[in-house]
């Protein structure tokens, strides 16, 4: 079809929601596109280029049908995928990749809670105490070999770096951001305790906005409004000419 001779229609430009490509003005997704050409030859060349890159409507329908047949388009697993997950993960016990052989030195790789599990233990970081200690332990357990707990040379102890808090947060920590914003904008200036700081209300009552009625009526170029006149060039009077640029 010669686009320069195409008959303009009442349709407008829009994106094709099926393919995501700017499909132009069209009657439906299965018909040939009728283009509106307000831009002449240059617009027609760009339009032809887009048409060459746009899939045939039949191809787009085939792709869409295949996608709908192979996917339920839901944000969760299909029945087949659910069965695969259950057979390979949920029904197979503990994931083997998350376990490591027990280190008799007492240094686990990652242990979230103390104790042994089938001769294996989790990780080098221990978050809760057991019979052994990790390299980084966040809560206490027994120090020494697991099987000689009563004969250990050292008593049970807490970790060297303990994560604690005093339970009494600072007032600034528990103050909501909304109230902090209120204090900054409309609260009294005493809250800031800095000289020269005004609240929003105090600033508006101290520095009243000036109103200049008919600002460009003055012929004096030294007046303040004259500096913002479109026909003022910084000379002794106004000129009815505009800037060259």
Swiss-Prot record:
One of its GO terms (cellular component) is viral capsid. Cleaved by the viral protease during virion maturation. May cause the middle segment to be shed from the capsid. Interacts with the peripentonal hexons as well as the hexons in the facets. Part of a complex composed of the core-capsid bridging protein, the endosome lysis protein VI and the hexon-linking protein VIII; these interactions bridge the virus core to the capsid. Pfam families: Adeno_PVIII. Keywords: Capsid protein, Host nucleus, Late protein, Phosphoprotein, Virion. This is Pre-hexon-linking protein VIII. Induction: Expressed in the late phase of the viral replicative cycle. The record marks 115-116, 167-168 as: Cleavage.
